[in-house]
Every structure is written in structure tokens, then in C-alpha cells.
A protein has these predicted regions:
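Active-site phosphate/ATP/adenylate-binding loop shared across adenylate-forming ligases
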Residues: 1-183
Length: 184
């Protein structure tokens, strides 16, 4: 529950701060990990992001890419190519995932399209919700790869144990603790 509510809170806080947003005019690209069936039973195990995608509200599937089949692939290179193929011609307005994983995907997409920056591929891209690792070492690379001066980067603090905080004011580096998600 807390991860889905935390994700909803991220979007709500972003939209409150950016009422001119065109967030819902396109699709959200969620890049998650992989999962596999437990060899000892019917339960699935794997990266939290994959388990969340597997069980996501069906309505969210209307506004996100790639398909579950692609998103849950376990072989990274195959998954990378499938995501690129299925999203290059889509209207992507937002990204969600781990900065290091997305960096690999972005570079793959740029190489595949022959474009210099991601704004040429997805001109309506406006926000990247990121977490899992510090964004600081990647910030400059992202600024070079996404030339849109109005691009927003929203930091989140989530882990397997729960969804703890989100950057609610993009002008400061701090995050808002999400104390109503059953964690504290």
C-alpha cells in the first residue's frame, strides 16, 4: 500500500507545484527491475519495482509504458531493446526509476535514434521521479542528455521497507516525510 500511495503523493505534490503541467497528456515511462517465480512455490520474488509493476492498479496501466510483459523481462539487454522499441515513438511526459538504470536506457535510445538529446525524442518530457540512489553524481549528465530547460527532477526516498519521503519543493534539496503511509 505505502508504495502506491507514495507514488500518488509524488504526482499530486508535483502537480500542485506545477499547475501548468501536461503530465497526463502523454505516458509515463516506469523503468523497474525484474522478477521471477520462486522455484519452491507460486510466489514471485525479485526487485520491488517489478513486484509493484506486476500488481499495479489496472488504471495506471493506461498512462504508463512499457507493457507489463516488457517491464517484467529479466534479461536486461533484451529488456532495454524492447523498451526502446516500444517507447521511441510515444509521447513520454514523465520518467520514474533509478538514475543509473535510466542513464543506460537514455544513452541506448539516443544511439538508436541518432539524436543528440532526449528532448529531440520526447519533446514533452517534463519530469523525472528518481530514487534508490543519490542523484548528485548523475545530475550534470542528465542536464546534458535532456536539454529542456524546464525539465524537473523530483527526488524520492523509497526502499523495500517503505516509501518514506519525496521532494515537495523543487527549489530546495530537502524532502517531505510521508508520515501517513503506515511507516512511522
Amino acid at each position: 500500500y505505502c508504495h502506491y500511495q507514495g507514488g500518488s503523493d509524488c504526482v499530486a505534490l508535483y502537480l500542485r507545484e506545477n499547475p501548468q503541467s501536461r503530465f497526463f497528456s502523454g505516458k509515463g515511462l516506469i523503468l523497474g527491475g525484474s522478477r521471477a517465480q520462486n522455484p519452491f512455490g507460486k510466489a514471485y520474488c525479485g526487485d520491488l519495482s517489478a513486484i509493484l509493476i506486476q500488481n499495479i492498479n489496472p488504471l495506471i496501466n493506461l498512462i504508463r509504458v512499457p507493457s507489463k510483459k516488457i517491464a517484467l523481462m529479466s534479461e536486461w539487454d533484451t529488456k532495454l531493446e524492447a523498451i526502446a522499441e516500444s517507447t521511441i515513438d510515444r509521447d513520454i511526459t514523465n520518467l520514474s526509476g533509478v538514475p543509473s538504470w535510466f542513464l543506460v536506457l537514455i544513452k541506448h535510445i539516443l544511439k538508436k535514434t541518432g539524436r543528440q538529446n532526449l528532448t529531440e525524442v520526447w519533446p514533452n518530457l517534463e519530469v523525472f521521479f528518481h530514487g534508490g540512489i543519490s542523484f548528485a553524481p548523475y545530475r550534470e549528465q542528465y542536464r546534458e542528455l535532456i536539454s529542456n530547460p524546464d525539465m524537473h527532477y523530483v527526488e524520492t526516498y523509497n526502499a523495500s521497507e517503505g516509501f518514506f519521503a519525496v521532494q515537495n519543493d523543487l527549489s530546495v534539496a530537502g524532502m517531505l516525510l510521508l508520515i501517513d503511509l503506515g511507516i512511522f
